[in-house]
């Protein structure tokens, strides 16, 4: 430890840190010593990580005499268990005001192990876990049919179902789920219960769509796109599957959608059930080879991966229909396609971002996006617009002639922007009354004002009259419906949360819509309610001083909130809305019961402090700082700038950071100051703020980070600006390299994890949204590709450490490979740490520990 010297007050910052006595020296530990420090803190994070219940489903109990109002189902990790399971809690009708009622988590399933034997997942399951960023084992999702009480879920490389509620009442002790046997080889992915007849369920097997009857075991393959060949190149088609880019960049994880209603046809009483699905042809998409997890076999896995500027898959929407008799036997199946080719009807459409059905099954709907992602259309497709698929041209023409002239697609809404469209789920069509030619719906839109807000829209469905047997080329505004009215329900410089799976809950009886948003502060998420009849007052339902993630009950009388703050670990509470029925907007939330109380923080945990500052261009930015635990007056501490910096992410907010970012506290406990700043480009601050990156990724973010560093150094006085490290993963890895390239005098070292080093090698959906296609933005691509600027990197060794998972199928190892070969050609020093068995996220605990020890060791030696 250095002795404390008191620098004279009039010397500048840099001068003060020249005085060796003022420099705080981090204590050096051996590799083993650092391992035991990491072990100590990991023990704690295991206690609370992933334990919180999620994926809630409220079911009302109807017996008047019983003590409980609802049964609440959810996924969670019971105490002492290592995997997620299906659980439930009973919510009592009455609670004592002053008592804290802790609901017990009850097991639904009896002695059930859901993780596959030895934790080995199929390739499809493993890649889906990557796309969804799932770290937990066990049951990670389930489908539920409320009337019949049927649950369906994937587990142990198979499918299972069980029933609770429904006709047979509620169980009181755990049950054995029933495995659904199959003739299919390979995993059955994306299973869903048929909403119109829960005897049937669907799944994807080997890239085709199947249905099966739970009661009789009958299985039927509905589509025949995939041949099941071992070579990816020879087998480019799939049905009902979301492709890599759609999952990774648009958060859509399914490629098919059940019609919620059945139709009866003919005198025999046959019932028709329908599924809308996306058919994909990837024959023109580039194939890349990524090392296979079975490294010792020296194999590679082949993937279709569309690089920016190259061909995307060819897509179409189709219908699969099947008919069943009164015994539930499948009598016939039929594949239907649009009356004209998809690309003729919708020539500008590059991506199907979302799809579904209106509740009455009268229309399928889809959200279409163009390739630059600056134009979105919401389109209704009546099932009668689809005709039987056939190779026979005469039959096709006869079917097309039979489609009534007034049957057509309807474009009911359009969004246009010069920035980019952030795709989300929020679209709520109201039921149409008989013979009505209008569709009323709720929609969130960010393009109108630059902030995401809720609108109530009424579109007039005007049919033009088409002869579908004639060749067709659409005009500019083909199928576009007049908008009769569009009422803003929310407004202002804040946003309604719509991305990343955010939901709204609509109570059609009281004409209220419940939503989550940042109305009070960009640092907190809250649950709000507003009337969609008489738009006006917006009422907040959650407690300020915390950030909440909420789920409403089906009858709008209760909600669950999972909430935390920077200083309080997460807890999960159930609230009941109570008050006079004649003023539902102002019903007050009353704490009802707790499902999980906040765990205690680890003994050495000191939460970060949130700060804000104004940049030279007068933009308000937020940051957080972890103060070194061993602060001594006058001492300057080495500082780690932890960075992400890209779009769609917000690191600085009033939620607990001690689980995912526990490592930042470890750094502070060792004597480092840790700074995190959300600069321009991060989310939750509106489209203009995020859009600062448009066409110039890597060119604006470092400025904001450096200004934030300087602000913190002045405000706190313990930061040693001559010893600053920059570190991050993914986009943060890319910016760590950018920092060392453009500001080598600010950053002494950079530690870059899984960085994008050349934008030309990244995918279409992400890169083109933010950077356009390469031919339109050559300068932006070159300026933003770190591998093309290695000559600016420092010549001193031990200033650059690169980390990357060798199996990464998102930011391919190619990026690091290319960067390193450029470094070698330029004669630049670097250090490289490869994780041979990891993908884009480090999964294996040993790899995670190794990375953390490597980070601490590199910092103590070279910062």
From Swiss-Prot:
One Pfam assignment: Peptidase_S9
Activity dependence on pH, as recorded: Optimum pH is 7.5-8.5. Little activity below pH 6.5.
GO biological process: negative regulation of programmed cell death; proteolysis; pyroptotic inflammatory response
Residue stretches in coiled coil: none
InterPro entries per the UniProt record, alphabetical: AB_hydrolase_fold (IPR029058), Dpp_8/9_N (IPR045785), Peptidase_S9_cat (IPR001375), Peptidase_S9B_N (IPR002469), Serine_Prot_S9B/DPPIV (IPR050278)
Keyword set includes rRNA-binding: no
Positions with a binding annotation for Val-boroPro: 730
Regulation: Inhibited by the serine proteinase inhibitor 4-(2-aminoethyl)benzenesulphonyl fluoride (AEBSF), and by di-isopropylfluorophosphate. Inhibited by Val-boroPro (Talabostat, PT-100), a non-selective inhibitor, which triggers pyroptosis in monocytes and macrophages. Val-boroPro inhibits activity by binding to the active site, mimicking a substrate-bound state, thereby displacing the C-terminal fragment of NLRP1, leading to activation of the NLRP1 inflammasome.
Tissue: Ubiquitously expressed, with highest levels in liver, heart and muscle, and lowest levels in brain.
GO cellular component term, pick one: cell leading edge
Modified residue annotations for N-acetylalanine: 2
Enzyme Commission numbers on file: 3.4.14.5
Similarity-based family: Belongs to the peptidase S9B family. DPPIV subfamily.
Disease per record: Hatipoglu immunodeficiency syndrome: An autosomal recessive immunologic disorder manifesting in infancy or early childhood, and characterized by failure to thrive, short stature, skin pigmentation abnormalities, pancytopenia, and susceptibility to recurrent infections.
Protein name: Dipeptidyl peptidase 9
Organism: Homo sapiens
Upper taxonomic lineage: Eukaryota, Metazoa, Chordata, Craniata, Vertebrata
């Amino acid at each position: 430890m250095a002795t404390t010297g008191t620098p004279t007050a009039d010397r500048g910052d840099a001068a003060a840190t020249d005085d060796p006595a003022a420099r705080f020296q981090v204590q050096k530990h051996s590799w083993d010593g650092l391992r035991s420090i990491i072990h100590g803190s990991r023990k704690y994070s295991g206690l609370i990580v992933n334990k919180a219940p999620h994926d809630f489903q409220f079911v009302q109990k109807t017996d008047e005499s019983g003590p409980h109002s609802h049964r609440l189902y959810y996924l969670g990790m019971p105490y002492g268990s290592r995997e997620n399971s299906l659980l439930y809690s009973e919510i009592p009708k009455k609670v004592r005001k002053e008592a804290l009622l802790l609901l017990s988590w009850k097991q639904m399933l009896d002695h059930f192990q859901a993780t596959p034997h030895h934790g080995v997942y199929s390739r499809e399951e493993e890649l889906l876990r990557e796309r969804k960023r799932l770290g937990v084992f066990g049951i990670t999702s389930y489908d539920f049919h409320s009337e019949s009480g049927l649950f369906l879920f994937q587990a142990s490389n198979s499918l299972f179902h069980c029933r609770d509620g429904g006709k047979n009442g509620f169980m009181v002790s755990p049950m054995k789920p029933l495995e659904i046997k199959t003739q299919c080889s390979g995993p059955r992915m994306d299973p869903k219960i048929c909403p119109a007849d829960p005897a049937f369920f669907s799944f994807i097997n080997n890239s085709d769509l199947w249905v099966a009857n739970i009661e009789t075991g009958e299985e039927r393959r509905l589509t025949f796109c995939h041949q099941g060949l071992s070579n990816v190149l020879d087998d480019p088609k799939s049905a009902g599957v979301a492709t890599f880019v759609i999952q990774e960049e648009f958060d859509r994880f399914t490629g098919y959608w059940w019609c919620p209603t059945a139709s009866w046809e003919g005198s025999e009483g046959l019932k028709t059930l329908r599924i809308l699905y996306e058919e994909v042809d990837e024959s023109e998409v580039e194939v890349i080879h990524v090392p296979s997890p079975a490294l010792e076999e020296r194999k590679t896995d082949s993937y279709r991966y569309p690089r920016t500027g190259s061909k995307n898959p060819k897509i179409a929407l189709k219908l699969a229909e099947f008919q069943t008799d009164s015994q539930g036997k499948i009598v016939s199946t039929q594949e239907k396609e649009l009356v004209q080719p998809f690309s003729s009807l919708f020539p500008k459409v590059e991506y199907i971002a979302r799809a579904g059905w209106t509740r009455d099954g009268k229309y399928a709907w889809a959200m279409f996006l163009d390739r630059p992602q600056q134009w979105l259309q919401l389109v209704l497709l009546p099932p009668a617009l689809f005709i039987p698929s056939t190779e026979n041209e005469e039959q096709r023409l006869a079917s097309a002639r039979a489609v009534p002239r007034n049957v057509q697609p309807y474009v009911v809404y359009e969004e246009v922007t010069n920035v980019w469209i952030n795709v989300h789920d929020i679209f709520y069509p109201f039921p149409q009354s008989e013979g009505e030619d209008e569709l009323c719906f709720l929609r969130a839109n960010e393009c109108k004002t630059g902030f995401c807000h809720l609108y109530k829209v009424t579109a007039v469905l005007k049919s033009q009259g088409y002869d579908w047997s004639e060749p067709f080329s659409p005009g500019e505004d083909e199928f576009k419906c007049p908008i009769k009215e569009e009422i803003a329900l929310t407004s202002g410089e804040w946003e309604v949360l719509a991305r990343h799976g955010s939901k709204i809950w609509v109570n059609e009886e009281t004409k209220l819509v419940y939503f989550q948003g940042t109305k009070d502060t960009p640092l907190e998420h809250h649950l709000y309610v507003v009337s969609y009849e008489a738009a006006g007052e917006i009422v907040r339902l959650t407690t300020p001083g915390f950030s909440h993630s909420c789920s409403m009950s089906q009858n709008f009388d209760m909600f669950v909130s999972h909430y935390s703050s920077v200083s309080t670990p997460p807890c999960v509470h159930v609230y009941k809305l109570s008050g006079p029925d004649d003023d539902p907007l102002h019903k007050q939330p009353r704490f009802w019961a707790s499902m999980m109380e906040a765990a205690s923080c680890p003994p050495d945990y000191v939460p970060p402090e949130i700060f804000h500052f104004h940049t030279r261009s007068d933009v308000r930015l937020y940051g957080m700082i972890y103060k070194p635990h061993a602060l001594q007056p006058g001492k300057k501490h080495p500082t780690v700038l932890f960075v992400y910096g890209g779009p769609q992410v917000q690191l600085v907010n009033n939620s607990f950071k001690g689980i995912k970012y526990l490592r930042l506290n470890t750094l502070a406990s060792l004597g480092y100051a840790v700074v995190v700043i959300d600069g321009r480009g991060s989310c939750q601050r509106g489209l203009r703020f995020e859009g600062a990156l448009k066409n110039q990724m890597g060119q604006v973010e470092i400025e904001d980070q450096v200004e934030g560093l300087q602000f913190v150094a002045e405000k706190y006085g313990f930061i040693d600006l001559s010893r600053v490290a920059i570190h991050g993963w993914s986009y943060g890895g890319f910016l760590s390299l950018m920092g060392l390239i453009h500001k080598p005098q600010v950053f002494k070292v950079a530690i870059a994890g899984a960085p994008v080093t050349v934008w030309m090698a990244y995918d279409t959906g992400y890169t083109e949204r933010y950077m356009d296609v390469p031919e339109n933005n050559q300068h932006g691509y070159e300026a933003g590709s770190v591998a093309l600027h290695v000559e600016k990197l420092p010549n001193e060794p031990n200033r650059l450490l690169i980390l990357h998972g060798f199996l990464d199928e998102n930011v391919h190892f190619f990026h690091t490979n290319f960067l390193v070969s450029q470094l070698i050609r330029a004669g630049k020093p670097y250090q490289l740490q490869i994780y041979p068995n990891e993908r884009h996220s480090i999964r294996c605990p040993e790899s995670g520990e190794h990375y953390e020890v490597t980070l601490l060791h590199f910092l103590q030696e070279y910062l």
